[in-house]
Amino acid sequence: MTAIIDIIGREILDSRGNPTVEVDVHLEDGSFGRAAVPSGASTGAHEAVELRDGGTRYLGKGVERAVDAVNGEIFEAIGGLDAENQIQIDKTMIELDGTSNKSRLGANAILGVSLAIAKAAAEAAGLPLYRYVGGPNAHLLPVPMMNIINGGAHADNPIDFQEFMIMPVGAETLKDAVRMGSEVFHTLKKQLAAEGHNTNVGDEGGFAPGLASAPAALDFIMKSIEKAGYKPGEDMYVALDCASTEFFKDGKYVLEGEGRTLEPGAMAEYLAELAGKYPIISIEDGMAEDDWDGWKALTDLIGNKCQLVGDDLFVTNSARLRDGIKMGVANSILVKVNQIGSLSETLDAVETAHKARYTAVMSHRSGETEDSTIADLAVATNCGQIKTGSLARSDRLAKYNQLIRIEEQLGLQAAYAGRSILRG
């Protein structure tokens, strides 16, 4: 009854107006699943390949080749299979692709099918996606990392680091956490406007003011947290995404906005200095994706008291994560479904992290859609943290709103991760 009888791929647009893949899956019993695939702006060199068409159509960014793969080869290979056999289906698609990075069929094609099948199977089972994937113990609502100031590749301003986020650790519930974040977000907007800064929002809904440095951005955030009625380092903490690979040149970190160039050791010390001065509890991609020595230095310096998240470093890849675990590098993995390209491999990466006592942070991409799958996956995996943008733009709010619904559905079973994520 849960056999796959039809798969329909199509080209839709993401939050940046670029094409992406959407997939519908129909099962024999009438159950249906739909998934849309996200896309990143700053991408790691080791990510699975997002297949684009090239040529002039959509300035080369069309995804008709990936859609053709969904409607053709992939459907031929998995049509008739039982949607409940997620691992077998994902394995079949990966083997059909035949490359190490999904470059033939495209990770965007494979992922769209993988997620849509999980949704259809959940509907067939009469379960919400988080319960279908996570089982009876899926009840932990994640602390949001809310991106309120943008720099780097996500903004046209001098700030070198890509994201400055607030984490409402002191909230009692996820719903309260969203409210607290919204209050700080709107307070920050007023503060920026009062001092003559631009308050337009970027790809992920955060502001992109013309501030000169990371400390300048952090100072603004501290003032906004306090003015909104909260205590930095108690109610609200801060997280950074440095996206350091973007400014790692010839073995050095070139901070153009701050007008200085740092050796890896000095970069690690600079981040440690910021973490000592401000209530920073998480730093993502503090060092470049292949600067393993720099990562080791940073981990040795502050890994016992600060979450050090590997995004470009690990690219949701269990093999790279295992290398990092062996080397004692970082202590957390950012989980982006399209970096690895299937649901099964995503869940494997989270499990690998948890077994090694590394944390996992479920994450969006800068190019998103109204699809809210990652909200369900954050709860399904009990990862306790989610990174899904600011308190603006419906493509970001779709995830927060879904988490609010999930918390309501769980009722007394629901638990907000809150202070449990703090280290040291």
UniProtKB/Swiss-Prot annotation:
Functional pathway: Carbohydrate degradation; glycolysis; pyruvate from D-glyceraldehyde 3-phosphate: step 4/5
Gene3D superfamilies recorded: Enolase-like C-terminal domain, Enolase-like, N-terminal domain
Active site (UniProt): E204 (proton donor), K336 (proton acceptor)
Cofactor(s), by name: Mg(2+)
Record-linked SMART domains: Enolase_C, Enolase_N
Biological processes per GO annotation: glycolytic process
PROSITE patterns named in the record: ENOLASE
A GO MF term: magnesium ion binding
Family to which the UniProt record says this protein belongs: Belongs to the enolase family.
Annotated protein name in UniProt: Enolase
